[in-house]
């Protein structure tokens, strides 16, 4: 199955399950969880069901395209359903079947692995999903986002698209994956990967990155004070990405690292709190078809 068809099949499957099918968010981020369709919508009482593909950037993970299964840019497929429905594990297994992976013919294991994002003030309990010995999915019941308790509890399912594609196409390297009939993954992304790695590890200016962090932090604080939640989150995400760039450059001490994380976490919590206040002022509009309010 081509890489693009994996995304198409997952879109079709989760659409049939009632999920809103959305597009990636247009700001650099380290994981699909940072998309406001997850980070903001996971908190508060309103029901929410969404699925989307998310390109993710983790600058320190780059290897100039020389590593067969590690890159600074990759794709996740993200599903969030709130409240978490009954039988969600079975639905997940059925989604694998829609990709041509029959659960009865493979060793699929749910391995306990609780998840945490210090910069987002977010954590949850759940599992890694292993397919014939390879991790392909993270399965998490969110407990907090932005330091706010999740009530009701949402389920997050995060598929590792490259790993699933490697399994389906029997490839040893992501760069050999067939994106479609004519192009390989490397035809599209290898030059991008090499140039971004050169920037991440060699060409980025640590001084400029530090200045940008301060600018982004200042903008986020100003926007939070003005109750502009979405643009405030944009600048929190920029702070997070800038921190990751500084980390990749190797210019952050242990002490500085803790301080940067705390600054971002504080901003994320304030954005989350602002979001709840904003939705409450609107009388939680998505509750109109729901019978329960969780506060």
UniProtKB/Swiss-Prot annotation:
InterPro entries linked to this entry: aa-tRNA-synth_II/BPL/LPL (IPR045864), Gly-tRNA-synth_heterodimer (IPR006194), Gly-tRNA_ligase_asu (IPR002310)
Entry GO MF terms: ATP binding; glycine-tRNA ligase activity
Catalytic activity: tRNA(Gly) + glycine + ATP = glycyl-tRNA(Gly) + AMP + diphosphate
EC class of the enzyme, as a word: ligase
EC numbers for this chain: 6.1.1.14
Subcellular localization: Cytoplasm
NCBIfam families: glyQ, PRK09348.1
Quaternary structure (record): Tetramer of two alpha and two beta subunits.
HAMAP family for the chain: Gly_tRNA_synth_alpha (MF_00254)
Protein name, as recorded: Glycine--tRNA ligase alpha subunit
Species in which this protein is naturally found: Prochlorococcus marinus (strain MIT 9215)
High-level lineage: Bacteria, Bacillati, Cyanobacteriota, Cyanophyceae, Synechococcales
């Amino acid at each position: 199955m081509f890489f693009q068809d994996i995304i198409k099949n997952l879109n079709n499957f989760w659409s049939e399950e009632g999920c809103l099918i959305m597009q990636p968010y247009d700001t650099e981020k380290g994981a699909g969880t940072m998309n406001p369709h997850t980070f903001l919508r996971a908190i508060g009482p309103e029901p929410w069901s969404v699925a989307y593909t998310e390109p993710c950037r983790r600058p320190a993970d780059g290897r100039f395209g020389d590593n067969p299964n590690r890159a600074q840019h990759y794709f996740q497929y993200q599903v969030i359903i709130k409240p978490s429905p009954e039988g969600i594990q079975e639905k997940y297994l059925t989604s694998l079947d829609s990709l041509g992976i029959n659960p009865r013919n493979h060793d699929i294991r749910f391995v306990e692995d609780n998840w945490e994002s210090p910069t987002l003030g977010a954590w949850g309990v759940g599992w890694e999903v292993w397919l014939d010995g390879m991790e392909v999915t993270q399965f998490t019941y969110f407990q907090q986002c932005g330091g706010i308790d999740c009530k009701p509890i949402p389920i997050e399912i995060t598929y590792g698209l490259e790993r699933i594609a490697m399994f389906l196409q029997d490839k040893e390297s992501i760069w050999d994956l067939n994106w479609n009939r004519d192009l390989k993954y490397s035809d599209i992304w290898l030059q991008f990967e090499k140039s971004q790695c050169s920037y991440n590890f060699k060409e980025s200016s640590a001084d400029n990155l530090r200045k940008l962090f301060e600018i982004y932090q200042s903008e986020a604080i100003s926007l939070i004070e003005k109750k502009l939640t979405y643009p405030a989150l944009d600048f929190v995400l920029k702070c997070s990405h800038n921190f990751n760039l500084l980390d990749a450059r190797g210019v952050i001490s242990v002490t500085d690292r803790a301080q940067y994380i705390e600054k971002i976490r504080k901003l994320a919590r304030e954005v989350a709190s602002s979001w709840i206040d904003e939705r409450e002022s609107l009388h939680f509009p998505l509750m109109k078809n729901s019978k329960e309010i969780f506060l």
